[in-house]
């Protein structure tokens, strides 16, 4: 079976290979992967409503400034998730490094989504 697989891989210009997390050529890939997955969070799990009392103490100018900053951060995270991190994929040295970059791209999209939760809550309570 291994011989057939090797023949298949060598006969295709850009073969698709399965990642093997049991054999990692660059230990830095595992270190970064573990750090990224250890820091994983979802905006739905963060009780943004706990910040409402503080939000209500802000002046209108402070609220407007905060919303503008969040708008810019949403755009930045969107670009980082759909252009930035993805653009690094062709330079990946290993499949594990590719996995790290796609994880980063995913988390940037999660970050962009988190601002939507903040926007929605602030609009309801303005």
Question: Which stretches of residues belong to each language-model region?
Answer:
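Conserved small/polar residues in nucleotide/adenosyl-binding loops
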Residues: 124-126
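Amphipathic alpha-helical hairpins
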Residues: 96-118
